[in-house]
């Protein structure tokens, strides 16, 4: 893949993620998108919901590609804070 193709794909993924509804705790929009993208690349994806008595349920996505090493683990957040008043935005997502 050429550098220009990589940049185009990266911009496409970032654009799509920005458009996903993902305000805490409703981050399922971004997780659904990431699950579909990773499964299309051959990853096995699994969703797990963590819950606690006093907090909203939190959806998590785990993906795996193969079983042989070497292994790499990446952990990140897909949730964001509320956008505030959209009327204050010059451009929406």
Task: Give the ranges of each region predicted by the language model.
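Acidic/His- and Gly-rich active-site-bordering loop/insert found
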Residues: 2-93
